[in-house]
Swiss-Prot record:
Protein name as it appears in the record: Probable prefoldin subunit 2
Protein family (similarity comment): Belongs to the prefoldin subunit beta family.
Gene3D superfamilies, per database record: 1.10.287.370
Keyword Isomerase attributed: no
Subunit structure: Heterohexamer of two PFD-alpha type and four PFD-beta type subunits.
GO CC terms of this entry: cytoplasm; prefoldin complex
Keywords: Chaperone
Amino acid sequence: MSTESAKPALSQEAIVAQFQQLRNEQRNLVNSLNTLEMDLREHKTVIETLEAADPERKCFRQIGGVLCERTVKEVLPQLVENKDFIAKTIQMVTNDLSKKGSELNKFKEEHNIKIRGEHLVAEGAKGDDAEDKAENRNVLVFN
């Protein structure tokens, strides 16, 4: 009888572990997306600056940790190509992120997972109750 009661606990632990893994994957995608968006902004700024510069002016570009001397007309097309690639990658990561969010929500519904504190954010808790409820945030509950 004790082995029968141990099985559900293990399965719940496995469910929690899988849920946490899905959440971590989602966080990693968000971090990747933020990094890519920062890179895109930097590329746009550099491209705007170089477009205003003389095409024969020398500039420096770091390639794999090595600083290379080039001209603006050599570097600009490479930067535009990199910017376009980053924009496409951002679109792919955004799609992956929405799929991961759907997968996470489906997993929550299938296993009846509720996160304590989720409803508090939506309600916008105020006053002394907010302090009491803040302690209970982000706790997984299984039914």
